[in-house]
Amino acid sequence: MTRIELKGVWKLSKNCAIIVAAGKGSRMGFDINKVFIEIGEKPIIQYSLECFESHPDIDEIVLVAKLNEIEKFQHIIKSNNMKKVKKIVVGGNTRRESVVNALSVIKDSDVVVIHDGARPFISHDLISKGIKYANKYGACTCGVTPKDTIKVKDKLNFIKESLNRDFLISVQTPQSFKYKLIWEGHNHKIDENINITDDTSLMEYLGHNVFVYNGEYTNIKITTKEDLIFAEEFVKKFNNVKNSLT
């Protein structure tokens, strides 16, 4: 729980994490769910699970999984003595359906922190800020300024314009919300032609402001084989630094 001040009154905020891990590794050319791929002798999903498990302000974790992979997740959870993973729910046909399935089993939480299981290098700081700004603004996400120049092209592949990076954000997770706001949002009828790519897109569509705070460039999503190479090197260097301090 988190102790927060709202309008001069101090209260405890109960915080629940949803980790979405029901995806595939198709873009990487693997037949298995990419969150089970090992980096640094641990499956990708274990990194984010451990980060939320060890965060003092996270009260419970709901994991979203494919039905035929639940036993694999249970093995990881039990063998690492994780106590905060209270429920594993089956994912839906879309990410939005998966999040709804997780939200439906959460009781009495003030803030929900939603994270992609394929982002192993989440930090306590990103989680803490997500909880803080969700309590303050209702909806928030972390993100980083793109390093490359971003341009818009036309249908014939000619550049139309260059965009100002000062106003561009590469959105990451976690994305954090007051529970009531995100629950009501997901239960709102949405035009099927509207492309809802993440939970902040839903908030935008419904007219809610979403606060953006600084993410971390290391908080990558493992999507390609190149991402996997970077992740392996990052873990090696992190372990080398840690070993040099002990």
Swiss-Prot record:
One of its GO terms (molecular function) is 2-C-methyl-D-erythritol 4-phosphate cytidylyltransferase activity. Pathway: Isoprenoid biosynthesis; isopentenyl diphosphate biosynthesis via DXP pathway; isopentenyl diphosphate from 1-deoxy-D-xylulose 5-phosphate: step 2/6. One of its GO terms (biological process) is isopentenyl diphosphate biosynthetic process, methylerythritol 4-phosphate pathway. The keyword Transferase applies. Signal peptide: none annotated. Pfam families: IspD (PF01128). It is an enzyme of class 2 (transferase). Keywords: Isoprene biosynthesis, Nucleotidyltransferase, Transferase. This is 2-C-methyl-D-erythritol 4-phosphate cytidylyltransferase. It comes from Clostridium tetani (strain Massachusetts / E88). The lineage of its organism: Bacteria, Bacillati, Bacillota, Clostridia, Eubacteriales.
